[in-house]
């Protein structure tokens, strides 16, 4: 009798570089390369008002190589500028997450609260974030807390609305079981309501963090000081278009990383079958 192991083949070792050659890497890389080539062609001719990729790299490589220089005042590297903006976003978004989740669960759990507050929230959420900035400056009298308030008011609405929807998705059978078992309010919240709402909460958080990053860049252009938004505006006033472009690239990368960070937290908290 032939050995039962005769047909077995040794397992192939995974190439640690295989990810680099995967479609998820190659396709975006090709798209970026095509974009750069088109950009280079369009902006290399005479009369172009925008720099080409090569010119951007030549004019901004000191900023890229030394992102944390500090010459005092607002003359700081891109790393410091982005960190200042991220700090404001972290404070405003964290406050919006706490308040928004609490409000959303309260409204989604009570028909009375939903009927009373939903029309008000639907009106307030349509107000552009920057429209709140003059009100915040008038009330708080300082630029820093005003910028944080703009972040808060920007992020809170998607969090409230999505959490409310999630709290309303608890199946009626679950509610009936909780009554039969005479679960306490805390038991009902932690075992039934919150798990049902978690996927919706993270949807609101992902939308909120993206809007927060958009809003702080715009708000900093108006309030001044250290921050990536004011850096872009100051570069425009100085006709440093290459610096604007490299800053926009950094803004986009940070926005992507923020979204991926919330998605990573979601993968740790939300069971796969609920996604």
Curated annotation (Swiss-Prot):
Look up keyword Ribosomal protein and say if it applies.
Answer: no
Which CDD domains does the entry link to? TM_PBP2
Which InterPro entries does this chain map to?
MetI-like, MetI-like_sf, NtrB
List keywords of the entry alphabetically: Cell inner membrane, Cell membrane, Ion transport, Membrane, Nitrate assimilation, Transmembrane, Transmembrane helix, Transport
Tree of life domain: Bacteria
Task: Share an example GO biological-process annotation for this protein.
Answer: nitrate assimilation
- Listed GO cellular component terms? plasma membrane
MF terms from GO for this chain are:
nitrate transmembrane transporter activity
Gene source species? Synechocystis sp. (strain ATCC 27184 / PCC 6803 / Kazusa)
PROSITE patterns, sorted:
ABC_TM1 (PS50928)
| Name of the molecule in the record | Nitrate import permease protein NrtB
Membrane-crossing residues?
Answer: 25-45, 89-109, 120-140, 147-167, 189-209, 213-233, 238-258
Q: Where is the ABC transmembrane type-1 domain?
A: 82-262
Q: Does the keyword Ion transport apply?
A: yes
Its membrane topology is listed as: Multi-pass membrane protein
**Subunit and partners:** The complex is composed of two ATP-binding proteins (NrtC and NrtD), two transmembrane proteins (NrtB) and a solute-binding protein (NrtA).
Function as written in the Swiss-Prot or TrEMBL entry: Part of the ABC transporter complex NrtABCD involved in nitrate uptake. The complex is probably also involved in nitrite transport. Probably responsible for the translocation of the substrate across the membrane.
Annotated family:
Belongs to the binding-protein-dependent transport system permease family. CysTW subfamily.
| Localization | Cell inner membrane
Pfam family for this entry, one:
BPD_transp_1
């Amino acid at each position: 009798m032939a050995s039962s192991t005769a047909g077995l083949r040794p397992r192939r070792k995974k190439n640690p570089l295989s990810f680099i050659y995967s479609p998820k890497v190659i396709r975006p890389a090709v798209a970026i390369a095509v974009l750069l080539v088109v950009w280079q062609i369009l902006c290399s001719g005479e009369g172009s008002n925008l720099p080409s990729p090569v010119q951007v790299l030549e004019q901004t490589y000191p900023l890229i190589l030394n992102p944390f220089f500090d010459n005092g005042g607002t003359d700081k590297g891109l790393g410091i500028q982005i960190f200042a903006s991220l700090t404001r976003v972290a404070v405003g978004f964290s406050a919006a997450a706490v308040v928004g989740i609490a409000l959303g669960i309260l409204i989604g759990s009570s028909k009375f609260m939903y009927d009373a507050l939903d029309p008000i929230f639907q009106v307030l959420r349509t107000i552009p974030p920057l429209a709140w900035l003059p009100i915040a400056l008038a009330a708080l009298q300082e630029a820093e807390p005003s910028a944080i308030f703009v972040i808060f008011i920007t992020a809170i609405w998607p969090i409230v609305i999505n959490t409310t929807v999630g709290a309303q998705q608890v199946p009626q059978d679950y509610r009936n079981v909780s009554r039969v078992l005479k679960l306490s309010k805390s038991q009902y919240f932690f075992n039934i309501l919150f798990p049902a709402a978690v996927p919706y909460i993270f949807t609101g958080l992902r939308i909120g963090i993206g809007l927060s990053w958009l809003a702080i860049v715009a708000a900093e252009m108006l309030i001044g000081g250290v921050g990536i938004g004011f850096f872009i505006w100051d570069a425009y006033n100085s006709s440093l278009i290459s610096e604007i472009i490299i800053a926009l690239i950094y803004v986009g990368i940070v926005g992507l990383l923020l979204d991926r960070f919330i998605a990573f937290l979601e993968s740790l908290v939300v069971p796969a079958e609920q996604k």
